[in-house]
């Protein structure tokens, strides 16, 4: 069913939150630590390890993006691996494929912004939704240089997300003077937030 959106096995928010808490150490040990060392002489940074999305942000995302359907929340449990360069990034993808061959995860969705192009904000990374022990979790792969820039602008990103400006940063489907003006205004708001 290629057009069916990926969903958790339940839409009970509290069941999902409890499962994320129980799965967290296993996800850390079986997935993130494996990726941190796969084809690497020295372990890669995994930022803060496996983390659970904050309750308030999870509820907000469920309400704003998924019409209240918690089964659509695929990144409640997530973890990041920092790659030194594009070659290292490719190694992490090979590691994820190996985890799938070994039956540890099943890859469900891959958004590879290194290969496919940056977000409207200019950010590039890869977000992989995988099924791990019957739940959907997110593996984020980042490039070290991009993470350094992201740290500087994260406050502006969060403010833009809260104001629902991120979609406004994308190129308008049709070029009209008004759409171009709105696009530039949204970009200036985020730029201004970065400078504060």
Question: What do the predicted segments below correspond to?
Answer:
Residues 62-192:
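Long beta-strand-rich cores associated with HINT superfamily self-processing modules
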Residues 1-73, 90, 151, 163-195:
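Charge-rich, low-complexity segments
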């Amino acid at each position: 069913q290629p057009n069916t959106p990926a969903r958790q096995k339940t839409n009970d928010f509290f069941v999902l939150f409890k499962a994320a808490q129980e799965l967290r150490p296993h996800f850390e040990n079986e997935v993130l630590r494996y990726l941190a060392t796969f084809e690497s002489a020295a372990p890669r940074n995994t930022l803060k390890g496996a983390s659970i999305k904050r309750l308030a942000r999870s509820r907000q995302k469920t309400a704003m993006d998924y019409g209240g359907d918690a089964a659509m929340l695929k990144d409640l449990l997530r973890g990041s691996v920092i790659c030194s360069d594009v070659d290292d990034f490719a190694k992490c993808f090979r590691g994820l494929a190996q985890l799938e061959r070994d039956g540890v995860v099943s890859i469900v969705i891959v958004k590879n912004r290194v290969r496919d192009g940056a977000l409207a904000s200019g950010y590039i990374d890869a977000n992989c939704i995988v099924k791990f022990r019957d739940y959907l979790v997110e593996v984020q792969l980042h490039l070290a240089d991009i993470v350094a820039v992201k740290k500087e602008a994260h406050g502006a990103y969060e403010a833009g997300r809260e104001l629902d400006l991120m979609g406004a940063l994308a190129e308008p489907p049709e070029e009209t003077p008004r759409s171009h003006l709105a696009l530039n205004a949204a970009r200036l708001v985020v730029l201004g937030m970065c400078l504060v």
